[in-house]
Amino acid sequence: VTLPMIGNYLIHAASSHAGERGFGFNDMSERHTAWVLSRLAIEMKEYPTAFDKINLYTWIDEVGRLFTSRCFELADENGKTFGFARSIWAAIDVETRRPTLLDIEALGKYIDERPCPIEKPGKIMPAENKAEGIPYSIKYSDLDINGHFNSVKYIEHLLDLFDIDQFKTREIGRLEIAYQSEGKQGMPLTLHKAESAPDKQDMAICHEGKAICRA
């Protein structure tokens, strides 16, 4: 199971969890709003195999005026933990693309004190001024249901910057990504990767020299 696959599992679980509680895609659409993923941190102890049964747990951790945080745990059928994840979401007006205020009272009813023992997403240093960018243009297959650059596609294209042989001998322990602006079909991008410390890479996707995400 790859990191992008896990990213898709997390987003689908978040969508289902929200939908069952009255603040999913359809409910938000009726209010002319939509959830936007702002930050994501995934930390894996080990990766499931293709034959492992995965139990995925998700819960709301905090609710603020503009952002809500959601946690995840991936475990096998015997309860052994594969990894945890933390995410931060904002609700935006679909017309103006601006943040809208969250209903703290309504969402707050679903806050769970379940522990998520990994660090919250932190500051990510820019990579675009440390490394030449590889050009890429957003294509139809990169788009989500709203016609914007899919959150997991950011991750896929950043991982494509690595030599495939590295994935045969090593695994990513932690991925942290900050989504800074939306991408649309045909938008020209540059993808950047620079080593910031042993076993740590800073990455960025930029449009016209400005980062639309950092990882």
Regions found by a protein language model. Give the residues of each.
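Small beta-barrel nucleic-acid-binding modules, principally OB-folds
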Residues: 32-47, 170-182
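HotDog/MaoC-like acyl-thioester-processing domains
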Residues: 43-126, 179, 183-186, 194-215
